């Protein structure tokens, strides 16, 4: 990102992290956000009713973030599922989140439910039943949860186009995405 923080990139004046957190809040579920130490990302969430937790070992990778989130979720709501919504996928909105939640409930609440793109590639969000929380608390390194999901039957929910998998990592990708969405820079 050439020194820029992709989670603070704006869409119609709103930082991506705040926008995705607001989408999660629109689901009506409690929202917990795991972030590295205080800074601009925390500031972007000011005024939102979320539980923030600090990922002290964020340099370790995605495993540390998911582990921290799972520990917090297990402590606050041990009998509730955990939805993982990666904030750097800007195409996901409240409707998509509700779609995943509704499918999880329809499946009986004990199956992993995960968004995919039109090609079937796994994306975000995904929701995991409480019985998997302990597996997530043991994640390490840059494991995005693959080891915790190993052997699980995953119900896939297609989210139109590539909204569930579009991860923008460069200023050029951001510019192209904004242009395709009709959103000014």
Labelled PLM ranges:
Residues 123-134, 171:
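Conserved nucleotide-sugar donor-binding
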Residues 9-12, 133-137:
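Short, flexible loop segments at the rims of nucleotide/cofactor-binding pockets, characterized by
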Residues 119-120, 131-132, 162:
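Short acidic/polar capping segments at secondary-structure boundaries
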Residues 134, 138-185:
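Conserved alpha/beta core of the MobA/IspD/sugar-nucleotide pyrophosphorylase nucleotidyltransferase superfamily
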